[in-house]
Amino acid sequence: MEHTWRWFGPNDETTLTDIRQTGATGVVTALHEIPNGEVWPVEAIKARKAMIEAHTLRWSVVESVPVHEDIKKRTGNYQEYIQNYKQTLLNLAECGIDTVCYNFMPVLDWTRTDLDYELPDGSRALRFDQTAFAAFELYILERKGAESEYSDEEKAQAKIFLENLKAEDKDRLVANIIAGLPGSEESYTIEQFREKLDEYAGIDKDKLREHLKLFLEEIVPAAEQGGLRLAIHPDDPPRPILGLPRVVSVKDDIEWLLGAVPSPVNGITLCTGSYGVRADNDLVDMVQRFGSNIFFTHLRSTKREEVAGSFHEASHLGGDVDMVGVVRALLVEEKKRNDNNAPSLIPMRPDHGHQILNDLEKNSKPGYSKLGRMKGLAEVRGLELGLKSTL
């Protein structure tokens, strides 16, 4: 695997010099300063690429070129935004970038309720508390139709949870959910959030799938022209939330995606932490089944909790993800590619990381503390080296 590191640009507290010292050889980044829907200019791409290469690193993956909400809904200026997206892909290809990660999640990217969940060893992790989320959706957001989606017991527990929240904790919960997490390019107030959700009225899973297919039918030819691979990121968490449909959550969704627009450049980002939240997602089988279409991987693990739907982010080699099996399957896939004289290395980044040691004293981006990710990268690298000796 190609060891990479997510970098949020020149203002990231983790510098390119730091990244070199982690052992990573590739960088995963984007031009976050460019508003959603606008074309990424060649000059800006070249400047960022030169900055990375000046530190003897490679810009391995763009994560991500955000898909404008109008494209997902097929409303407003969606056709203009699709044309801009295609031009951005061509500009990236012109600059020698070969892989783009993107997602098709409506309104929110990844969602958590707690950004400072304390683990038994004193480190901190990200957490999705289903009861807290229900309290937000039912009694703070007061989403229309939400009542029918929860049992009486779930509603009672959510009410108790909310009643025990201090005012500042309530504000924090709201901010955690709707204020935008790292990599997300949008944030909202409660009223704006309600309006955004209402815009998806009438768009169910089948309709969102249709919109994704139409989008891919337009951008895949541009990607093929530029020799650039498209790697869709799964939903996080991988199930419908807030009345919004989700279209990249399980194996059947991947099969649909690859069959809807067959192309050697239409592929996936294997995010083990996202897919792994669901017990019915067999990650090793997914690698074996879709290996040739895995263009990028995020390796992290989650631990499902007693309350259905709740989970927290575990250590990279802990939790519910069979990381040994997943890495072994990825190495087997790389060997197949190498045997067929195809580009073999799959870019991998240690996704998220616990806040540990002196990172606990820093105001790091949630999930993106330096030391926690470096620990995860070292663990996965050691696992990879050990497994290679057995293949």
Swiss-Prot record:
Keyword Manganese: yes
Transmembrane segments: none
Organism superkingdom: Bacteria
PANTHER family hit by this protein: MANNONATE DEHYDRATASE
One annotated GO biological process: D-glucuronate catabolic process
Functional pathway: Carbohydrate metabolism; pentose and glucuronate interconversion
InterPro entries xref list: Man_deHydtase, Xyl_isomerase-like_sf
Role noted for this protein: Catalyzes the dehydration of D-mannonate.
GO molecular function term, any single one: ferrous iron binding
Enzyme Commission number(s) from the entry: 4.2.1.8
Family: Belongs to the mannonate dehydratase family.
Top EC class of this enzyme: lyase
Keyword Nucleus appears in the UniProt entry: no
Protein name, per record: Mannonate dehydratase
